[in-house]
Amino acid sequence: MLFSDLTINDKEPIYVQIKKYLEEMIAKGLLPHNSKLPSTRELSLILKVSRNSIISAYEELKSEGIIYSVSGKGTFVN
């Protein structure tokens, strides 16, 4: 399952690790254009991390134009 192979370490902030992981999955084509990402709440439960870490990772990816959000619909790969 996607996201099950992410191992969180203490070497860098959690949100940075999540951001890098998502960038890799997108680059490899495992998260194709316009595919819906899990909600921040759902992904925080899957990864067993703070929802704020997911929000920070998503915000950074949005600011770089890698993902986008549609109000009431979710977050998608750009």
Regions found by a protein language model. Name each.
Residues 1-78:
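N-terminal basic, amphipathic alpha-helical segments
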